[in-house]
Regions:
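Nucleotide/pyrophosphate-binding catalytic subdomain
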Residues: 1-209, 216, 220-222, 229-231
């Protein structure tokens, strides 16, 4: 499990009196704000998820992403085509799989926050969707599942009923060009495509608020979210 925590981070930064600024949809992360990010993700949200899994009869172990993910500074292109300096935001370049495989061998669920260690030893804030995709590339599971607060990839963002149930990888670029895949969905879908190219059979986008959505998506013919696959 790789989790996020954007809203909790924004609340914590506001409480600390630290301005939250976004460039091209990415949170600009300063040395002061990355301390809050790591605190919220790795020492508040992460133990909470681990605790809930354990309470429900599962076995889970928490990891700060700094123990698992390696990264380089991420510099998205601005409107003029120039790289934007958004501070301590990382692009995951490597995954330390040893502790994850050790957990899996013991039927323990690893729960990882989306932070990473840079080449400079600094803590970086990372996109959770991209981090999850890179974990899948490294571990090669059969399935990768993205759970969020939307029903799946929507043909019309304003219509929750317009879920695209199946999307072949070859059709992704056309949907980007048509504006169907936009904003925060772009890194999510790009990560899914990267995972499929690396050997993951299927990637699912499902609504985590909906009871049994994971079981219904994987084990029923109709499904309830979006499935991305090679064909």
């Amino acid at each position: 499990v790789v989790h996020g925590g954007g809203r909790a981070i924004t609340r914590a930064l506001n409480q600390a009196g630290i301005e939250t600024r976004f460039e091209q949809g990415y949170r600009v992360t300063t040395p002061k704000s990355v301390e809050v990010v790591e605190q919220v993700l790795s020492r508040e949200i992460n133990p909470g998820i681990v605790g809930m899994i354990n309470e429900l009869g599962g076995k889970a172990r928490g990891f700060s992403g700094t123990e698992i993910f390696h990264c380089k500074p991420f510099r998205p292109l601005g409107q003029t085509g120039e790289p934007l300096d958004i501070g301590l935001v990382g692009e995951v370049t490597g995954v330390n799989t040893a502790p994850l495989l050790e957990c899996i061998a013991q039927d323990i669920t690893p729960v990882i926050s989306p932070t990473a260690t840079g080449e400079d030893g600094q803590v970086y804030n990372c996109n959770a969707d991209v981090a999850a995709g890179q974990a899948a590339v490294a571990l090669r599971p059969k399935r990768l599942v993205y759970m969020s607060d939307v029903p799946g990839l929507l043909q019309n963002p304003d219509d929750p009923a317009s879920v695209i149930s199946h999307l072949p990888v070859a059709e992704v670029e056309a949907l980007k060009a048509g504006g169907v895949i936009s904003k925060g969905m772009i890194p999510k879908v790009d990560s899914a495509v990267t995972a499929v190219a690396a050997g993951v059979e299927k990637v699912f986008f499902i609504d985590g608020r909906f009871s049994h959505s994971l079981l219904l998506e994987i084990f029923t013919d109709a499904g309830v979210g979006t499935e991305i696959a090679e064909k």
